[in-house]
Amino acid sequence: MTINQLLQKLEPTSPILQANFGIERESLRVDRQGKLAHTPHPSCLGARSFHPYIQTDFCEFQMELITPVAKSTTEARRFLGAITDVAGRSISKDELLWTLSMPPRINAQEIQVAQLENEFERYYRNYLAEKYGTKLQAISGIHYNMELGKDLVEALFQESDQIDIIAFKNALYLKLAQNYLRYRWVITYLFGAAPIAEQGFFDQEVPEPVRSFRNSDHGYVNKEEIQVSFASLEDYVSAIENYIEQGDLIAEKEFYSAVRFRGQKVNRSFLDKGITYLEFRNFDLNPFERIGISQTTMDTVHLLLLAFLWLDAPENVDQALAQGHALNEKIALSHPLEPLPSEAETQNITTALDQLVQHFGLGDYHQGLVKQVKDAFADSSQTLAAQLLPHIKDKSLSDFALDKALAYHDYDWTAHYALKGYEEMELSTQMLLFDAIQKGLHFEILDEQDQFLKLWHKDHVEYVKNGNMTSKDNYVVPLAMANKTVTKKILADAGFPVPAGDEFTSLEQGLAYYPLIKGKQIVVKPKSTNFGLGISIFQEPASLDNYKKALEIAFEEDTAVLVEEFIPGTEYRFFILDGRCESVLLRVAANVVGDGKHTIRELVAQKNTNPLRGRDHRSPLEIIKLGDIEQLMLTQQGYAPDDILPEGKKVNLRRNSNISTGGDSIDVTETIDSSYQELAAAMATSMGAWACGVDLIIPDRTQPASKENPHCTCIELNFNPSMYIHTYCAEGPGQAITPKILDKLFPEVATSQT
């Protein structure tokens, strides 16, 4: 079989960049002084026996972050950013993720093997510690996983002389592995970032700085007598099996190589079931990047891997790989500013890159990546190791690494209500995703714009829309709650108090109703909207003009409008989940308090600088607006937006207290009488709602409620209620709702947290 020159035969329009990617990142947990953390793996991160994204590697303090499969390098980094965010906010607030591959100053005695449930995995780690030493195990890095795209492989297969797709894929991945090991020095030269070891790491003096201790024989490598041939897949499989049989290796995974075949549980299965993808294991952590690897690196490596496929495989594989290993060792232990040695043939690599880009018509971005590679080949100061040199102080990078770790820690805790990389999604969905990752649930975003998620654990699958719309709700329930008239009728039939009023489908009908409500306190609101849109509240009798304006505002939001009696009292939002009240909020209407110096418009602008305020429900509090409704409210109180408000004077900009219209949230879950919580839960149950927001007006919360004497009125039930307002409150402790949603959906995971 020949697999050389296959890329060259493809049509220029072939999907050359099609691939699947995954990233694994190892990082040590340290304290704020840069010393190893001696705390256990965080219990909030679910059980390590099944967690798909956050594991421990060798040491108890060595976290391993694993992305799901991504269809692009950008998405892989996005996954890693989110998982890093979860990990960074799940460890103690006094702990950080170390930003270098080489550990801080350590001694062998303080390195604790990961306390895993699996007996063999514990035994295996103790075996490695005894055989290779513990300090080497604390070296961390990045593993770059890539599977060539299905359509790309099929196109290559059609150009080949093969009839067996599995044999073809094996040959293709074997060639890529061979050339990767042959040119491994390119990765070490460009991206090596382990120039020094902290004092005491090595038992003997080692010249430094270098490009990468981790990628040299001073890093984690097998004993010298372990030599595995990549000349054929059969040779590879048989060699490792023989070493295990002889007792030189304890398991297949003990064989360490810069590249590993992946996709089967045992190596021999590769022969008949095939290689699925390759794992490239020799990337140092980039401390200049919060997640340890840059977008440019991801894309440059992808291009280099394709160039390695473009190049012919070596004729004498074992000899070529031995030469490649020797060259890599030389470059890894060279000073970061030392030019490439003469035996490092860069011309064939840059030529392959140029031809690849030209043949497939890749654009300016990829042409720029090729130029960066060429420039770095010509000027070693542009390599990653060289960029670290100015930060070495007293033969140490610890201060630099600690500063970076602190900066990344602070970033993780900035806007801590959001999931990094997914900020454009609705906030409750971000919070649910954060908790799903933390608990160890698999996730897939089916439709980002529609906030539609797939979550699963083993064979158990749940679909979630907008954070709490699930299979637990009957289809008709949200439809009923979206219709305020239907909601009122169902609640009234069940014996619960609701406000009196009427429904209108035209402005003329509503205006004709004015004589009946003239002189009364009323509420005008759309029939079927959420988030408090289009609602006007008149605590004083409305003039005909203001009433007409309120009707017009409501009709802008819906084709039907309700005019109801105004119920005096304080409005509270009860969050009901599966028949139980989980949180109660007092919501204060959008308001400003005067200082005698600034106009109302300026006070609104000042209040909007609060970092908790944002737009489109992506922050816990919403930006306060000065639209028609707010200006109408001001007019009713005798003010205009450009009036200076007296010191201490509070004016409301809304009658309704929805957080979505600029209100403030106050958690009163622990202080309100439990009878109201039970009553609200009963109302939700009468609607058949699983997750529901119940809005009650309570004149005097000190009086206990009952169904016979409720001492309250239900003004609205909300399907898909916002959860973030209950967690990140303007005042009070806040109640975490999204973990309870997940516990209800996946009780088997909730009971297996360790």
Annotate each PLM feature.
Residues 1-129, 136-138, 175:
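Terminal catalytic/cofactor-binding subdomain
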Residues 415-480, 486-489, 508:
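ATP-binding N-terminal substructure of ATP-dependent carboxylate-amine bond-forming enzymes
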Residues 634, 658-671, 685-689, 698-754:
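C-terminal active-site "lid" helix and adjoining low-complexity regulatory extension at the edge
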Residues 97-102, 317-323, 561-565, 572, ...:
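A short glycine-rich, hydrophobically flanked beta-strand micro-motif that places a catalytic Asp/Glu
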Residues 454, 463-469, 473-624, 673-677:
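Active-site nucleotide/adenylate-binding loops and adjacent lid/helix of ATP-dependent enzymes
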Residues 247-259, 301-304, 308, 553, ...:
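A long amphipathic alpha-helix within ATP-dependent nucleotide-binding catalytic cores
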Residues 8-10, 105-106, 116-134, 138, ...:
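Loop-rich catalytic cores of soluble enzymes, especially ATP-dependent carboxylate-amine ligases
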Residues 1-37, 41-54, 323, 327-438, ...:
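Sequence termini and other peripheral, non-core segments
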